Amino acid sequence: MLDWLTFNTPNNFLTVDVHSHLLPGIDDGVKSVEESLEIIQEFSALGFKKLITTPHIIKNYYPNTPKIIAQKLKELKAEIQKKNIPIELEAGAEYFVDEHFMKELEEGTALCSFGNNFVLIETGFMNKPIFLNDVIFKLQSDGYKVVLAHPERYIYLQEDYNEVHALLSSGVHLQVNALSFTGYYSKSAKKLAEYLIQHEMVNFLGSDIHNKKQLLKYKKAIKSSGFQKAGQLSLLNSAL
């Protein structure tokens, strides 16, 4: 277990971000190419070299497919090149765990993964999906490495930290949102995020940026003790 320290010169030690919503117009993230470019330029100024953007895939709300995502990625990368922004852009996806996703897994649908076959998943915030363990097992059986997005935000995990330990024991990687260290989402999310850092249970940090307003909050988050503490962990961001 790590001890909390005081940092006199807070900095952004990350060069790779693994969670954002920067492909315009396909989910609840940025709405225009212009907004995407502004945010990406700011990421570059913060020292990022690579962004792995992860649009939502939720059947009844954001029915994105690998084809749709690939096309949007191609278009945005072309704009980045025009602006000469020195940053690499890749895309995965953020899959919502529900019966539709389970069906896709059973049908062998190709997924949007990143890095060494990592797949980012999310759940509803209130209750643990009854088939979450089945989804995790199926993904792992298919050769994917499961990454749970922002576990600190789920109420069912805030109420039972043992559930988080169980997820780790099952081979799930945990991705914490930097904004959680500021209390942006809730006090309970901040508390769990700090617990996960304290107990060295975090594998990835992500920005989960949806818009310029959140980017401003992110700049404050990198100064938080929780974020700086995470810099002492063996995070997998830099390996991507």
What spans do the regions from the language model cover?
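Extended substrate/RNA-proximal surfaces in nucleic-acid metabolism proteins
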Residues: 2, 63-173
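Hydrophobic faces of well-ordered beta-strands that scaffold small-molecule active sites
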Residues: 16-20, 51-53, 89-93, 119-121, ...
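Active-site environment of divalent metal-dependent phosphoester hydrolases
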Residues: 58-61, 96-98, 153-157, 181-184, ...
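His/Asp/Glu-enriched short active-site or ligand-binding loop at hydrolase and phosphoryl-transfer sites
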Residues: 171-183
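Non-catalytic positions within long, well-ordered alpha-helices that form the structural scaffold/packing
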Residues: 44, 140, 197-198
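Short acidic/histidine-rich active-site segments
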Residues: 202-218
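An N-terminally biased module of ancient metal coordination in phosphate/nucleic-acid-related enzymes
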Residues: 1-85
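Mid-to-C-terminal alpha-helical segments outside catalytic/metal-binding sites
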Residues: 2-4, 219-240
